Amino acid sequence: MAGHSKWANIKRQKARVDAKKAQVFARLSRAMIVAARQGLPDPAANFQLRTAIEKAKAAGIPNDNIERAIAKGAGTLSGDGRQFESVRYEGYGPSGIAILIEALTDNRNRTAANLRAAFSKQGGNLGETGCVSWMFRQRGVVQLTGAIAEADLLEALLDLPAESYDLDESGAIVYCSIADLEALSTQLRQLGYPVEDSELRWIPNDYQLVTDGEQARSLLRLLDTLETLEDVCSVTANLELPPELVTALEATL
């Protein structure tokens, strides 16, 4: 993790700002809808749903809203005739940065039009299905916060279903297979590690370094715009920036 700032870490730096935005409730609600749609609507039997509910409660979302989101995902919400579907979109930003977007929508045409407009405004373009997805793979991600002793973490991970990890002064990110996410998160908690988040995440196979300030600014504006669109659940890019450039751009993020 040392040396350059990858998009996953840039997102973490932006989290405090993003958390203040009104879209946070909608984003967390969509996460619950997706989790309930993809698995059982019972959080005790659905790790992703349970995690999404924990995040929603931590953000102060009322229980009624949580129950409504679960019912919507399960298709049992009365009076709501909309049919939602999970859709993946792909495109390129400035400097040829690959961008993968997951959305939950009841109108593909509306979502695609909004995404296309966002890409065009910042010099990117929405691509065809498959144009960049081969550059990413989905993995389980457990995020730890606070000062983590690398030697102790490495020793602990030798006995856990972890594949790799990144570490810096703010915490650690531990990666695993999709199937091992729940077990890894649970076992790290049991060992006393401060687990902040557990989720499935698309991880770039390789990162593309951008050193031009204007290109980087346009990319960050594009990614921020995409993340605030109503139907968007997640945005992933293979972007890597030098830390000094991130520092210079922090005021504009």
From Swiss-Prot:
Localization per Swiss-Prot or TrEMBL: Cytoplasm
The entry's keywords: Cytoplasm, DNA-binding, Transcription, Transcription regulation
Pfam families: TACO1_YebC_N, Transcrip_reg
Keyword flag Aminoacyl-tRNA synthetase: no
Cellular component GO terms, alphabetical: cytosol
GO-annotated molecular function: DNA binding
One GO-annotated biological process of the protein: regulation of DNA-templated transcription
Record InterPro entries: Integrase-like_N (IPR017856), TACO1_YebC-like_2nd/3rd_dom (IPR048300), TACO1_YebC_N (IPR049083), Transcrip_reg_TACO1-like (IPR002876), Transcrip_reg_TACO1-like_dom3 (IPR026564), YebC-like (IPR029072)
Similarity section: Belongs to the TACO1 family.
PANTHER family: TRANSCRIPTIONAL REGULATORY PROTEIN YEBC-RELATED, TRANSLATIONAL ACTIVATOR OF CYTOCHROME C OXIDASE 1
Identification of the protein by name: Probable transcriptional regulatory protein Synpcc7942_1017
Species, as recorded: Synechococcus elongatus (strain ATCC 33912 / PCC 7942 / FACHB-805) (Anacystis nidulans R2)
